[in-house]
Structures are given as structure tokens and as C-alpha cells.
Amino acid sequence: MFKIFVKINAIKNISAILIFSLLLLSCEDNDSSIKEIVNSDVEWQFTNIDDSVLDLELLKSNLSELIDSNYLRAIAISYNDQLIFDHYKIGDADKRYPVYSVTKSVLSAAFGKLFDQELIENENMTIDAFLNMYDYNDPEIKSTISVKHLLSMQSGIQDDVNYIRSDTPIKYILDQNLLYAPGRFWNYSSAGTHILSAVFQKITNENPESFVKKHIFDPLEITNYFWEVDANGLSNGGWGLYLTLHDMIKFGMLFSNDGKWNSDQLISQSWVNRSTSKMRAFRSGSGSWEYLPDNEAGYGYLWWINTVGDNEVFSALGYGGQYIVVDKTRKLVLAITSKESSSISYRRKISSIVFNDLIPIFPAAPPSNN
């Protein structure tokens, strides 16, 4: 059985940054009141692990580099399904943190549940099966956009985050010209994932937030969360989710265990494997790829994938330095939340420490009966 723990102790451009900042200030219940009161004292207490398993002094040394940063809010690590460390530099165990594009990976999990329940036939279904494309400009080409294109960031939809300020956000997005024919190139687009949210609602007659609550969050006992909506009340598919640090860990643990939580298969193993497999490969480590180390990275279905040693590791990543990193071989999950104002150098430091220093010191987890 998993130990459910309570321990008391778009990555894009300047315009996107401004929009995100406005959202933080304007949303009714967005936790913009996060108090920037810094806790500089670190209690170096590692639980559920000892020196016979891991060099704890080396772990402490690597963690210290992150914790000393002015941008870090909180960090937690679980190993072999148990929390071994957490630290709150800003906030506490009850604080909901904005996780930005980590939201996309949660939406991906929700789509996995749709496929598991056979509510959608396959990923190649085009969005004109769910949305009347003749309500928008250039319906012929946009009718060829598939669910797979949207899940893998290959739809050609522009990454214009101003949709969240529109009274008609879906029309705002789909009236714009495509950057390229669907399926031709990879291009990160929060607007595209908001179209996914609209497709999801059409399939289920339910807001993604409500569906996720019933089928994923409730079984994980995730109750202290918030999900922003657009002008029409639709869950924002691009960003907008707020989670506690431990709930970020829980979501990662669900995927580290192939979609299983306790005795319940919440999401099929086949979807976990498919959604965290590379649909597109590209070189990271420069420009906007400061969130991942400088190696051959890739993108799955709203998950980022890169290699650590011989293992593929996948991550839910959010603007400013929000991370849920999962290494299934090690049964290792790291959750990191950072200030939105974090610098590129800070995010590159996270990338280097997490993927080059922290993860490799953990051994593969022993076989589990869970």
C-alpha cells in the first residue's frame, strides 16, 4: 500500500510573462496572496531512507544548491512510494502553488481516462467531430487538426495566450491563421491545449476540472486545489492549476506506478506509457529549453521526456520553474515550485542539478508488490 503522507514541518516570451502576471493579480481565487516570507532554516531530516540506501550527505549537498536560491518556493522528493524530504522556503504544507503548464500534464491524464473508458475512439479523430469548424476562419484546414496533434503540440495553432482575456476564447484561437499544416512541425501552444479542453468538454458534457476531480483527484485525496477558467467557465487547458507541494508529489507517484494508486488502476498503464513516450524529439539546453538539460529531449502527450543515464525520465513543467519529475525505474518523484520571476540561469541550475546530480545518485527501486 502507498503511504499517504501529511508531513507538518509556457515557457515562452515576454508577452506571455505579462499575461501570466496579470492573471495572478486578477483572478478571484488564484492564491496571488502567497506571502513571500522566506524560511531560511532547513531541517535536514530525511525520512524513510538511510545511508545504507543512499549517500545522504551528497543528497544534502545537491539540495543545498537549490534551497539557497532566492527563487525557490518549495521542494519535495519521494522515493519508492515514500516521502523522504520536503522543505518550504516560501509557504507551507497547506499552501496552493501556481503550477502553470503542469496543468497540461493533468489534462493529458484526463484524456487517458477518456480513452480507457472508450469515450473517444482514438487519437486520430479530428476536432471537427466535436466542434463546428465552420464557425471559424479556414475551416477546411483546421478540420484536419486531430486530438493527437493537440496532445503532441503539432496542431499548428499559434501560441497566443491572449485568448484568456477574450469573451469568446475558442473563437479567438480558431479564427487565427495556423502557423503551418497540422502534423508538420512541433510548436508549443497553450492555446492549442485550451482547444483540447473544449474538445474534452464536448465529449463528456463536463468541465475537465469536474472530471479530474472525480476520476483522479478524489482517489488521490487531492482536495486543496484550484483551477482557473476562461470567460465561459471552461477549465483553462494551458495553465491555471494550483496544487500543494505534496499533491504535486502524489500526481507524480501515480505515474511512477503506471497509473495505479493503492489497489486502483486510475489510468491504464498503456496510456501512461504512450503519453510519456517521445512523439517528437528535439535538442534542449538552449533558448527556451532551459527547463531541461542539454541533451536529446522530446515531447509526448503533454509531457516532456529526456534521458538520465540509461533511463528515460518524464516531467510536467510549468512557467517560472515548476516541476514534477518522474523516474519510473527508480520510483523517484521530485516536485519543485519556484517564483514566477525566476531567471533563466536559475532554471538552468535546476535542470543541471536535478537531472545531472540528484537523480543519478538514487539506485533503482526494489521490486514492489503494489
Each model region followed by its residue ranges:
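Active-site helix/loop module of the DD-peptidase/beta-lactamase fold
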Residues: 117-153, 175, 204-239
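C-terminal motif of bacterial Sec signal peptides marking the signal peptidase cleavage site
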Residues: 23-26
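A short, well-structured edge-of-sheet supersecondary motif
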Residues: 62-92, 324-325, 331-335
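Active-site-proximal alpha-helical segments within enzyme catalytic domains
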Residues: 195-199, 239-260, 322-338
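Bacterial signal peptide processing site
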Residues: 28-30
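Active-site SXXK
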Residues: 81, 97-123, 150, 196-200, ...
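Conserved catalytic neighborhood of penicillin-recognizing serine enzymes
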Residues: 134-163, 181-182, 191-192, 243-246
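Active-site Gly/Thr loop motif
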Residues: 222, 276-333
